[in-house]
Amino acid sequence: MRPMPAPRPQRLVRSAGALVWRFTDPARVAVPGEPIDPADIEVLMVHRPRYHDWSWPKGKTENGESLVAAAVREVEEETGQIVTLGAPLTTQRYRLGGGQTKEVHYWVGTPVPPGHASERLRAPVARAPRTEIDQTAWTSPERAADMLTRRGDRRLLADIVARAREGRLVTTTLLVLRPGQGVTPRLDEAGDAHASASPAASSGSSASSGSSGSSASSGGPAVPAAAAAPAKPRPAPTPAMVASAAARRAAQVEQASAKKVEAAREPVDPALSRFGVRQAFDLIDLLSSFGVARAFASPAARSRQSLTPWASMGGGSVTLVDSLDLTATGSDASIGDEARLGRVRAFAAQRLREHASPTVLSVAGAAREAVIEEIRAYASGAVAGAEAPRLAHGQVLVAHVEHGPDGPVVAALETHGVTTKNPATHARKASKKH
């Protein structure tokens, strides 16, 4: 058998890692917005014997793995520390041999407290061999600056030190999830009625009621066509008969259309599709990477179900919030659309102002857009000027919030999604190519 050719190397090698820090005093609690003396923290470094250098824990993404999942996995493999991610840092790019470029995405990382739900939700990993990582060290930022080999790594360290001094190292995280894909509504009775009442269907039924229909219903033996009695000529339809038949058909079509319009007005609350269920399970890794500990969702089925695997496996709960559902009825029936959107924005603003654990909001439709709009209202600088993100099913918008004397500021926005592939979508794309 002829040997298979080696795969062509990718031009871009994607990697991910984290600058993990902790207080030198284990009893000290991180407070958002509090300035930190760099002498009061330690950073986690790794030594690679192959390159004889000290650097930050990082590594390549595996097949089908998201960047954030790769970052926490690589840190645990190389250091044994289970961490959660905070704000993103500057992406590092440098050339490799063979015309390749390596792109390394970094986040601020913090060790997970013992018993945290994120620890239970992580897949088990094997420690990196000593030929890859032979030493790890917690050290002061001052000493780390002397130990680091690459200039880019030292720039990342300087960024961490500046954030600590300015009270920007400790941030809060708010995630906005677009629920997973839902089932597609099937053709309703109104649609079937519309099809059966079409002019073509009506004319077909009229044509079937001729002489052959009467002979079939006679109950006796079939009569050869040549011996059949001559049919009486049908009188030509009068203009009044034609107008009456047309009016009946028009009434049937109008009635069917009215049923479809009425059905469209009814609130649709589809459950997750088979693909949406897979997305919900794959969200566990993404939410765990950011250490999500609280979850809010609208009462809509997809919003709830998208967080069910994460809550069930991690021992958490999902708080249902009626105000996040713009189709709410009953006591809310008298409230206008703008007032409902205002309540959604107020709920999002409250979450932004809290000094709370990482939180996810699972919201659909216009309510989700209102939440994102409120988050962007708290953004500053380049973040405020960036184009509003459009989320796909199963994607999350991650807002990293700094808390200063003037209130919360969204310092970074990033989008992440599950890497689940939909076979049906790929099949449709393939058929179009061929």
Spans of features found by a protein language model:
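Domain-level recognition of soluble alpha/beta enzyme cores
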Residues: 379-409
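Acidic, glycine-centered low-complexity repeats within long intrinsically disordered regions
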Residues: 207-216
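A short, acidic, amphipathic alpha-helical segment used as a generic capping/interface helix at domain edges
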Residues: 339-353, 357
